[in-house]
């Protein structure tokens, strides 16, 4: 089956040579169900955010484009509240620009570029597009707030958990007559790094 063989090659390349700030893998050994993560670019309102996407590969791939949507909420004129993305290579001609020579890495890289350079003239969210055009400061503020609230949520939870552990430790020490040496806390969050390579299972 062409889809399976093509996917195997593409996932192998994504594993050994991932585009900067992008990672992709198969979800629960399902051939057509992939997940991807894109690291928000520097000097953008999405900086330091990790955005998860769902990538569904149709049976006629690569003659049909993958179906991609954001699972992580993002404030962006070309991405709606359900995660749908307005991008030409995600649609077939004549309305779109998908062609079989493109691949998953190309799609994810294009989405990463769209995050850095929104296209307000072809929006899915008209109100956000208008804000981007005419009130850029307000747009940047809201986009950063969404990134903090949704794309960095795990980091905040880990920090809160570590803070709670420290408070408990301080309380116990205040009631103790002996001085104890502090132990290093485990369970620190693993930072997302585009250089980290993952092992991706091939299709069965």
Swiss-Prot record:
Q: According to its UniProt entry, what is the function of this protein?
A: Accepts ubiquitin from the E1 complex and catalyzes its covalent attachment to other proteins. Catalyzes monoubiquitination. Involved in mitomycin-C (MMC)-induced DNA repair: acts as a specific E2 ubiquitin-conjugating enzyme for the Fanconi anemia complex by associating with E3 ubiquitin-protein ligase FANCL and catalyzing monoubiquitination of FANCD2, a key step in the DNA damage pathway. Also mediates monoubiquitination of FANCL and FANCI. May contribute to ubiquitination and degradation of BRCA1.
Instruction: Name all UBC core domain ranges.
Output: 2-152
Family the entry assigns: Belongs to the ubiquitin-conjugating enzyme family.
- Oligomeric and partner information: Interacts with FANCL and BRCA1.
Q: Which InterPro entries match?
A: Ub_conjugating_enzyme, UBQ-conjugat_E2_core, UBQ-conjugating_AS, UBQ-conjugating_enzyme/RWD
Query: Which top class of enzyme applies to this chain?
Result: transferase
Primary location recorded for the protein, binned into one broad class: nucleus
Where is the crosslink of kind Glycyl lysine isopeptide (Lys-Gly) (interchain with G-Cter in ubiquitin)? Answer: 91, 181
Q: Which cysteines are joined by disulfide bonds?
A: none
Q: Molecular function (GO) terms listed?
A: ATP binding; chromatin binding; ubiquitin conjugating enzyme activity; ubiquitin protein ligase binding; ubiquitin-protein transferase activity
The location annotated for the cross-link Glycyl lysine isopeptide (Lys-Gly) (interchain with G-Cter in SUMO2) is: 190-191
* UniProt cross-references to CDD domains, sorted A to Z: UBCc_UBE2T (cd23805)
Q: According to the entry, what is the taxonomic lineage of the organism?
A: Eukaryota, Metazoa, Chordata, Craniata, Vertebrata
What is the native source organism of this protein? Mus musculus (Mouse)
Primary gene name: Ube2t
One Pfam family from the record:
UQ_con
GO terms for cellular component: nucleolus; nucleoplasm
PTM notes: Auto-ubiquitinated. Effects of auto-monoubiquitination at Lys-91 and Lys-181 are unclear.
Task: Locate the region Disordered.
Answer: 150-204
The biological pathway it contributes to is: Protein modification; protein ubiquitination
> Record's SUPFAM superfamilies?
UBC-like
Name where it's found: Nucleus
Which SMART domains does the protein's record reference? Answer: UBCc
Phosphoserine-modified residues are 193
Where are the catalytic residues?
A: 86
GO terms classed as biological process: DNA damage response; DNA repair; protein autoubiquitination; protein K11-linked ubiquitination; protein K27-linked ubiquitination; protein K29-linked ubiquitination; protein K48-linked ubiquitination; protein K6-linked ubiquitination
Catalytic activity, as annotated: S-ubiquitinyl-[E1 ubiquitin-activating enzyme]-L-cysteine + [E2 ubiquitin-conjugating enzyme]-L-cysteine = [E1 ubiquitin-activating enzyme]-L-cysteine + S-ubiquitinyl-[E2 ubiquitin-conjugating enzyme]-L-cysteine
Name this protein carries in UniProt: Ubiquitin-conjugating enzyme E2 T
């Amino acid at each position: 089956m062409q889809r399976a063989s093509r996917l195997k090659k593409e996932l192998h390349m994504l594993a050994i040579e991932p585009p900067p700030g992008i990672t992709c893998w198969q979800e629960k050994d399902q051939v057509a169900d992939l997940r991807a993560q894109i690291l928000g670019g520097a000097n953008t309102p999405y900086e330091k955010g990790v955005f998860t996407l769902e990538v569904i590969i149709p049976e006629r791939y690569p003659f049909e484009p993958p179906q991609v949507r954001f699972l992580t909420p993002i404030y962006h004129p070309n991405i709606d509240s359900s995660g749908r993305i307005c991008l030409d290579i995600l649609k077939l001609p004549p309305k779109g620009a998908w062609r079989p020579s493109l691949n998953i890495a190309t799609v994810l890289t294009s989405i990463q570029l769209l995050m850095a350079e929104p296209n307000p003239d072809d929006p899915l969210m008209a109100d956000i597009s208008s804000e981007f055009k005419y009130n850029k400061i307000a747009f940047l503020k809201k986009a950063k707030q969404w990134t903090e609230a949704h794309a960095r949520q795990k980091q905040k939870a880990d920090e809160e958990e570590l803070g709670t552990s420290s408070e408990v430790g301080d309380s116990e020490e205040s009631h103790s007559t002996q001085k104890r040496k502090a132990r290093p806390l485990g369970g620190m969050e693993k930072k997302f790094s585009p250089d980290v390579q993952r092992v991706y299972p091939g299709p069965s």
